[in-house]
Amino acid sequence: MQNPPENQGKLVRSIGLTSAVVLVISSVIGTGVFKKIAPMSYELQSPSLVLFAWLAAGLISLAGTLSNAEVASMLADSGGDFVYYRKIYNRFFAFLFGWTNFAVIRTASIASIAYVFAQSINSLIPIPNSSQELSDISIFGLHFFDNLGIKLIAIALIVFLTYFNNKGMKLGEKLSTTLVSLMVMAMLLIITLGLLSSSGSLEHLQQNSVRYNPESMSGSTLFKALALACLSAFWGYEGWNSVGYIGGEIKNPQRNLPLALTIGTLIIMALYLMMNFVYLYILPIDEFINIYEAKNGIGAVAVVKHFLGPWGGTLISCLILVTTFNCTSSTILLASRLFYAMAKDNMFFKKVDYIHPVY
């Protein structure tokens, strides 16, 4: 490994427990809690099973969190899972993990969350679309120019947040703290207003879909439906391990890193269960099945519009904007430490291991 240049900075352990918890929440809460109620309702056709799937996925994620936290406390360094793979297995598996994240996993996550951000803007302020002739152009079966306006907004967001987070961890941390505070307050407001709304009914939570057949929804069929629903829920929990990527910047990581992972995951579980309870309290499950089959709506938006009217739709759209903006920012910020660790270990482009002496 080459010696760093003289003007090379170094990573500083400046992230405390509270900030680490905020970053866990930031990197997890994105689109899943708003969009996945519809496909999960379609698969399970029962409110109680939908809530059970969210709980089961949360408990499995928590088990993963606790296992990861044990390793993170022993190997707290920049790079997170990459460092764990390298130490526990070997460089080859670490190499595969890192490049898979660069080529597919982190890249796709950032792109998909940014795209939902752009879609949310489009629902508030219509974005001009490309012409039909341009939209119909197909390259290897892919319509790159379809919804071009939305895609350009998503690209612009990624470029802006990459530049913004390039200015240092403290700036990204402050942004996440502000946005998480707004996000949690808005979610608690929706939960409170939903529970107090006269539009809701406990009967909605007790009534299965008109399509529900208790005889067929049992055994292997039930297991398959639960597995498919849990896949949707796991998308909502994805990203809890990302804070391990900044293990080299967390104060007292042997204590704070496991605590941040555990506390953050428990907070997310509680918010997800309460939000989905309100969804199913306000609307019967068949409404969510219809939303899924129509392919033209978001379950959370339909719920809030139902009990708060048009301004409720604006509120939930703004909340989705905040969460997707924040999740995109945190994913870009935290993933950069993975590629830094790879470059430092001569498994990635060498210039990526440069640390600005100021930022």
Stretches found by the model and what they are:
Residues I15, S19-G32, I153-F160, P214-A270, ...:
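Hydrophobic, membrane-embedded alpha-helices of multi-pass small-molecule transporters
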Residues P39-Y42, W54, S61-I158, Y163, ...:
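Hydrophobic transmembrane alpha-helices that form the core helical bundles
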Residues A118, G149-Q207, E238, L261-T265:
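Membrane-interface loop-to-helix entry segments
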